[in-house]
């Protein structure tokens, strides 16, 4: 079986790139012939993280320029099945023209405006043989009638797995980019006004971003005690910090497509406090706590609530959120089965 993966790429080893390579690895290990095309998007800059990830793979991985339809067409012609990551019209049309099965993984919620790219994506999605959406939220924005040619498969490549003993955990952790609408300012204000012992409940802010100077100024101006800022950390150190927290706090106001940080936390038995934002409540699971996006008072009350939970109840909650996650995630070998089904449908 020849499988072609095509995905837009900004040049870093981000969530989409990691997932594309994880699925390609799985199928390659099962004996399939695999090729990966990363289509450069505007502002593409190849980072060391992606370069290193590519170097250890044994199957062909190429970067193509925007508008390189000839390479796409030749690659689709080679394939038995094409797996597009997000609805790229040139990919779907090439597969349709060459009568090749084409499936999609759709990462982003559907914009219903008339700008060219959303319109082209909607057309491409309708023409594909099957589409998987990464969350119920994303799925509903594209196909609220849940047609037979669509389904849900959360995208997860590699997750942290080292679990810190409950007795060695403390406080809260935030692990998102420091940009507007990710909720870091809301969280700081809520943490500042919450009536909790900051020495026992520190707040660790992982990551970095354009709001760094504003965040540092806010902490100093308002005299917010208990905040720790480790800066940008390598993955293994970042994952360790997450596992050492009692709660992951993810409070965006931006229509999150899924919410990978919540899934990462749950995989090391760290429960979550989130906002009712896009697919985030689904990612955080039914054992999470939640509030309205941007509501500082509600978030502060949740911080106070969890600080009063008994250790016994906390452990039960953490175990429950982990085991629910195990049933939520799906193994990558499901894709091999799905490819075989769609190929057979073309042969009948």
Where on the chain are the PLM-derived regions?
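Conserved donor-binding/catalytic core segment of Leloir-type glycosyltransferases
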Residues: 4, 132, 164-193, 204, ...
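N-terminal strand-loop element at the rim of the active site
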Residues: 5-64
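Acidic donor-binding loop of glycosyltransferase active sites
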Residues: 79, 243-257, 270
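Short His-centered aromatic/hydrophobic patch
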Residues: 84-90, 106
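Donor nucleotide-sugar binding/catalytic pocket of nucleotide-sugar-dependent glycosyltransferases
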Residues: 111, 126-162
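Nucleotide-activated donor-binding/catalytic signature segment of Leloir-type glycosyltransferases, i.e.
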Residues: 216-233
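Conserved acidic donor-binding segment of nucleotide-sugar-dependent glycosyltransferases
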Residues: 288-297, 304-311
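A charged, aromatic-enriched C-terminal amphipathic alpha-helix characteristic of glycosyltransferases
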Residues: 311-346
């Amino acid at each position: 079986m020849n499988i072609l993966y095509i995905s837009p790429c900004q040049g870093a080893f981000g969530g989409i790139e990691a997932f594309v390579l994880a699925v390609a690895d799985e199928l390659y290990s099962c004996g399939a012939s695999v090729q990966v095309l990363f289509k450069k998007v505007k502002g593409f800059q190849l980072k060391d993280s992606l370069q290193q990830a590519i170097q250890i793979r044994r199957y062909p991985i190429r970067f193509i320029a925007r508008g390189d339809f000839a390479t796409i067409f030749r690659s689709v012609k080679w394939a038995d099945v094409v797996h597009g990551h997000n609805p790229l019209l040139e990919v779907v049309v090439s597969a349709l023209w060459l009568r090749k099965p084409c499936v999609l993984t759709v990462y982003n919620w559907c914009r219903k405006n008339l700008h060219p790219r959303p319109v082209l994506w909607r057309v491409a999605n309708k023409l594909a043989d099957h589409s998987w959406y990464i969350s119920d939220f994303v799925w509903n924005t594209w196909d609220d009638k849940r047609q037979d040619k669509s389904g849900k498969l959360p995208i997860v490549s590699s997750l942290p797995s080292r679990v810190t003993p409950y007795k060695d955990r403390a406080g809260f952790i935030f692990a998102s980019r420091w940009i507007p609408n990710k909720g870091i300012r809301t969280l700081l204000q809520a943490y500042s006004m919450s009536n909790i012992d900051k020495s026992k409940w520190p707040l660790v802010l992982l990551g970095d971003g354009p709001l760094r100077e504003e965040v540092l100024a806010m902490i100093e101006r308002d005299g917010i005690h208990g905040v720790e800022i480790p800066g940008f950390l390598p993955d293994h150190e970042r994952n360790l910090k997450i596992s050492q927290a009692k709660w992951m706090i993810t409070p965006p106001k931006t229509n999150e497509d899924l919410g990978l940080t919540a899934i990462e936390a749950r995989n090391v038995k760290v429960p979550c406090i989130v906002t009712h934002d896009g697919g985030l409540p689904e990612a955080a699971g039914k054992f999470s706590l939640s509030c309205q996006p941007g509501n500082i008072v509600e978030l502060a009350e949740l911080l106070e609530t969890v600080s009063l939970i008994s250790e016994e109840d906390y452990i039960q909650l953490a175990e429950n959120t982990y085991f629910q996650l195990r049933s939520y995630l799906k193994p990558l070998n499901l894709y091999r089965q799905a490819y075989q089904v769609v190929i057979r449908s073309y042969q009948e």
